[in-house]
């Protein structure tokens, strides 16, 4: 049975090799979306997590609502709203801009919860000690709590980046010329989507594997300081 399978219809090695240089051109947009969204999401997520932990209901409840909405709505729907929906109200984004905004806002919700969990896991005695020294809330947060929470938050934050790298393929649905979009073009021209999708999967796997190596390096580095 296995011997009768025509493997060239599943993965055409020649086509994969020949099309690789073209497909890899999309890696720039894949990395741009992933890393810029991660950076923006981290900044936004930090403020949202602090608002989420605030004693002021005026800050806490909007943060809760934001997190609930972004975690409950598929990122593809958010991309469609930004790219296809906003023009109806006179606001137009390029495909890349819509992708950056969508992924940044979405990842911020997950990062906010990661930050909140990491900050909450720091012993309460640290807060009490800082208070006895006369440190303000922000001085305590900046100088004592956040540095300790980094190591706790690092593994799940790295997973968010890996998820962003993989999810960036959804940007192809709004015509961003990233990896998957390039692969789809070749697949349609050569009538061989299977080969191109497998090739794309291998490229994503390679990118995520490299990112995982750096994740391990960072975790070991911060383990010495916390």
Swiss-Prot record:
It is found in: Cell membrane. Belongs to the binding-protein-dependent transport system permease family. HisMQ subfamily. GO terms for cellular component: ATP-binding cassette (ABC) transporter complex; plasma membrane. CDD domains: TM_PBP2 (cd06261). It is a multi-pass membrane protein. Coiled coil: none annotated. The keyword Phosphoprotein does not apply. Residues 27-215 form the ABC transmembrane type-1 domain. Part of a binding-protein-dependent transport system. Probably responsible for the translocation of the substrate across the membrane. This is Probable amino-acid ABC transporter permease protein YckA. GO terms for biological process: amino acid transport. The chain crosses the membrane at residues 31-51, 73-93, 94-114, 160-180, 194-214. It holds the Pfam family BPD_transp_1. InterPro entries: AA_ABC_transptr_permease_3TM (IPR010065), ArtM/GltK/GlnP/TcyL/YhdX-like (IPR043429), MetI-like (IPR000515), MetI-like_sf (IPR035906). It comes from Bacillus subtilis (strain 168). Keywords: Amino-acid transport, Cell membrane, Membrane, Transmembrane, Transmembrane helix, Transport. GO terms for molecular function: transmembrane transporter activity.
